Amino acid sequence: MDAAKMYGAVLACTDEAVLPVSQVFDAIRELGNEGVEKLDPLVITSASSLSKFPVESSSVDLVVLIWKSLDFPIDQLTQEVLRVLKAGGTTLIRKSSQSAVGSGDKMIPDLENKLLLAGFSEIQALQSSVIKAKKPSWKIGSSFALKKVVKSSPKVQIDFDSDLIDENSLLSEEDLKKPELPSGDCEIGPTRKACKNCSCGRAEEEEKVLKLGLTAEQINNPQSACGSCGLGDAFRCSTCPYKGLPAFKMGEKVALSGNFLAADI
């Protein structure tokens, strides 16, 4: 790809006092681009002594860092590179031709971690002494909607040609007959009382029903089979004849005065 069309503005930085343009072109060729001679890069020497690049923010397509020393201020430089790069711009870091042999082996792993923490993406080591990274095309704080994948429910294939069994064919004539209820000779009404000429046994059952209530004998001589009748409703059985009366002592007779119901006024 033509480098002049791909990179409109190129910035080259180095910690040396002099940087030949040929070294900048060689670094750009490592990206697989042709026609680098058409580029007109802006070169900054002794960049380690600068706190800020004399370049406007988001104005550069490609930043090439060529460094000789291993202790260059990478943290400060990455922030400046991010500032001057356009969204989606590329940075290329490589060691100088005058660097010590084997120094890149120690520099590359450390650079990858620092570039990642600084906010770069698509970090890639091209050679033992060259590393490439990109500035993300999105901005910090930007948001976008996630497309929800709509999964279609599985369709059930129904074979209408298959033989279906009629449910009614499984019932016999006896199953379809309504059951006959046993009818008594008493008139069945809402009260269900036995008639005068009852012969079904309802009259005998009604005679056996015990009506709960207090007799005069129970009031005068209270007796308790369970021993809890005089303790109150909380201790009485559900069928206790004394239910509803206040607590009393068994065998004790309570006498009221003659003027108990007389008005005080």
Curated annotation (Swiss-Prot):
GO molecular function: 2 iron, 2 sulfur cluster binding; 4 iron, 4 sulfur cluster binding; electron transfer activity; metal ion binding
Residues engaged in binding [2Fe-2S] cluster: 186, 195, 198, 200
GO annotations of cellular component type: mitochondrial intermembrane space
Region entry Linker, spans: 147-176
Signal peptide per UniProt: none
Matches recorded under Gene3D superfamilies: Vaccinia Virus protein VP39
Location in or out of the cell: Cytoplasm; Mitochondrion intermembrane space
One GO term of the biological process aspect: iron-sulfur cluster assembly
Domain of life: Eukaryota
InterPro entries recorded: Anamorsin, CIAPIN1, SAM-dependent_MTases_sf
Motif (Cx2C motif 2): 237-240
Keywords: 2Fe-2S, 4Fe-4S, Cytoplasm, Iron, Iron-sulfur, Metal-binding, Mitochondrion
Named cofactor requirement(s): [2Fe-2S] cluster; [4Fe-4S] cluster
Spans traversing the lipid bilayer: none
Region (Fe-S binding site A): 186-200
Annotated residues for binding of [4Fe-4S] cluster: 226, 229, 237, 240
Chain spans, region N-terminal SAM-like domain: 1-147
Listed Pfam families: CIAPIN1
PANTHER family: ANAMORSIN
Function: Component of the cytosolic iron-sulfur (Fe-S) protein assembly (CIA) machinery. Required for the maturation of extramitochondrial Fe-S proteins. Part of an electron transfer chain functioning in an early step of cytosolic Fe-S biogenesis, facilitating the de novo assembly of a [4Fe-4S] cluster on the cytosolic Fe-S scaffold complex. Electrons are transferred from NADPH via a FAD- and FMN-containing diflavin oxidoreductase.
Record's comment describing the protein's domains: The C-terminal domain binds 2 Fe-S clusters but is otherwise mostly in an intrinsically disordered conformation. The N-terminal domain has structural similarity with S-adenosyl-L-methionine-dependent methyltransferases, but does not bind S-adenosyl-L-methionine. It is required for correct assembly of the 2 Fe-S clusters.
Assembly with partners or alone: Monomer.
Protein name: Anamorsin homolog
Source organism per UniProt: Medicago truncatula (Barrel medic)
